[in-house]
UniProtKB/Swiss-Prot annotation:
The keyword Plastid applies. This is NAD(P)H-quinone oxidoreductase chain 4, chloroplastic. It is a multi-pass membrane protein. One of its GO terms (molecular function) is ubiquinone binding. HAMAP family: NDH1_NuoM. NCBIfam families: NDH_I_M. Its main location: plastid. InterPro entries: NADH_Q_OxRdtase_chain4 (IPR022997), NADH_Q_OxRdtase_chainM/4 (IPR010227), NADH_UbQ_OxRdtase (IPR003918), ND/Mrp_TM (IPR001750). Its EC number is 7.1.1.-. Belongs to the complex I subunit 4 family. The chain crosses the membrane at residues 4-24, 37-57, 80-100, 134-154, 167-187, 208-228, 242-262, 272-292, 330-350, 386-406, 416-436, 462-482. It is found in: Plastid, Chloroplast thylakoid membrane.
Length: 500
């Protein structure tokens, strides 16, 4: 049973089954929706079954490994495998994509293409998280960008083409650095390309070259989480995209950059990472303050939530730069936690817009009375986003805090400064989230819209929101549910630094 290529099956199922969508009749929108949801559910069940029976929690090594020679000419292998670092993002991808396909129920224009692109994106993301070959990682990284660009440019607001072009310029520009880094590492000191992650991890480079590789990969990944100053595509894109696409962007796409930083920069380039880590902590700290302050000034609801995503990813970057197992576990937990919370907030923003047709906060007001269910869920997820105790965000940010305070790498005064600045960011977070809730839901009704728009959340929407709320509260109450996946792998990664 262990010889069966489970990861290949998990990776290829969405895109191969999705290809059949194109043969469904043009007017069969309902059939397309149900078919896509069934594929996503089947994929999620397959994933859960395979990981439950074949994944050992206490083993930090690569599991479910597959290695097949693909192109002999330059020793290119189809090499897949998962460990404690990748299993969480893969399960998150399955969960959020399944809910995003349910959220896309109202999409009727070109619905066959829309759902096919969602499934193609699904395969690309699973491929990125499970690749064990540098070139395969790059191919999957790029494969995932094409459907995202088409989803952004074809469905959304009036400026969707502008925002999609901005997105592809940032991410494709970063991909050039990723390709150069992959080829540089693969071709270094060998006539035969060495693209295997394990071989690259044991390879030592001159310090100058390692710093060059590290910086190239950092630029490639900085556009995704995003890290300031490469973040400006995110508010525009979220402001224009359809909310089901926003769920995939906030829930999964932003996490790929943080995953790449740990997987390649930390694991394969440890000496350069120990030099760059203080700068990552500084940038992450500034990002929390900058994005929280900017979010407060946004009139557009979706842009305000987008800047809150940038702010929350700052704590992930601090965790990656802290060089302690506590903070790195917190960063990985924040990746999972924000995946759920960000997806839920964008879904709520989109469903609210579908009803009231306003995105600007100063045009809203008094929505709580006609739409109490949306008001309740928005309030709960706002509390989760501002790291309220009992929610997953609290545990993640607390671990990052604790990790940076106890880090032996930094002196006492810098640690105090970083902690104070992070605390200021955590004070700003409830200010912009609670003011957003006040402007939307409280006060008088400032607009004249026919009452037919004021239909509260239906069963489908409530089901999606409760499905996201349960893991958010579950992780908040029992964080070991996620931490047990990554704790051994994190120890193994950091052992390279303290032994070397």
């Amino acid at each position: 049973m262990n010889n069966f290529p489970w990861l290949t099956a998990i990776l290829l199922l969405p895109i191969s089954a999705g290809s059949s969508i194109l043969f469904i009749p043009q007017r069969g929108n309902k059939a397309v929706r149900w078919y896509t949801i069934c594929i996503c559910l089947l994929e999620l069940l397959l994933m859960t079954y395979v990981f439950y029976y074949n994944f050992q929690l206490d083993d930090p090594l690569i599991q479910l490994e597959e290695d097949c020679n693909w192109i002999n000419l330059f020793d290119f292998h189809w090499r897949l495998g998962i460990d404690g670092l990748s299993i969480g993002p893969i399960l998150l991808t399955g969960f959020i994509t399944t809910l995003a396909t349910s959220a896309a129920w109202p999409v009727t224009r070109n619905s066959r293409l829309f759902h096919f692109l969602m499934l193609a994106m699904y395969s690309g993301q699973i491929g990125s998280f499970s690749s064990r070959d540098l070139l395969l990682f790059f191919i999957m990284w790029e494969l995932e960008l094409i459907p995202v660009y088409l989803l952004l440019s074809m469905w959304g607001g009036k400026k969707r083409l502008y925002s999609a072009t901005k997105f592809i310029l940032y991410t494709a520009g970063g991909s050039i650095f990723l390709l150069i880094g992959v080829l540089g590492m693969g071709l270094y000191s060998s006539n035969q390309p060495m693209l295997n992650f394990e071989t690259s991890a044991n390879q030592s480079y001159p310090v100058g070259l390692e710093i060059l590789f590290y910086f190239g990969f950092l630029i490639a990944y900085a556009a995704k989480p995003p890290i300031i100053p490469l973040h400006t595509w995110l508010p525009d894109t979220h402001g224009e995209a359809h909310y089901s696409t926003c769920m995939l962007l906030a829930g999964i796409l932003l996490k790929m950059g943080a995953y790449g930083l740990v997987r390649i920069n930390m694991e394969l380039l440890p000496h350069a990472h120990s030099l760059f880590s203080p700068w990552l902590v500084i940038v992450g700290t500034l990002q929390i303050i900058y994005a929280a302050s900017t979010s407060l000034g946004q009139r557009n609801l979706k842009k305000r939530i987008a800047y809150s995503s940038v702010s929350h990813m700052g704590s992930t970057i601090i965790g990656i730069g802290s060089m302690t197992d506590t903070a790195l576990n917190g960063a990985i937990l924040q990746i999972i936690s924000h995946g759920f919370i960000g997806a839920a907030l964008f879904f709520l923003a989109g469903t609210s817009y579908d009803r009231i047709r306003f995105l600007y906060l100063d045009e809203m007001g008094g929505i709580a009375i006609p739409m109490p269910k949306i008001f309740t869920m928005f309030s709960i997820f706002s509390m989760a986003s501002l790291a309220s105790p009992g929610m997953s965000g609290f545990v993640a940010e607390f671990l990052v805090f604790l990790g940076i305070i106890t880090s032996p790498k930094y002196l006492f005064i810098p640690k105090i400064l970083i902690t104070v600045v992070m605390a200021i960011g955590m004070i700003l977070t409830p200010i912009y989230l609670l003011s957003m809730s006040r402007q939307m839901f409280y006060g008088y009704k400032l607009f004249n819209v026919p009452n037919s728009y004021f239909v509260d959340s239906g069963p489908r929407e409530i089901f999606i929101l409760i499905s996201i709320l349960l893991p958010v509260m579950g992780i908040g109450i029992y964080p070991d549910f996620v931490l047990s996946l990554s704790v051994d792998k994190v120890e193994a990664i950091l052992a390279n630094y303290f032994n070397g």
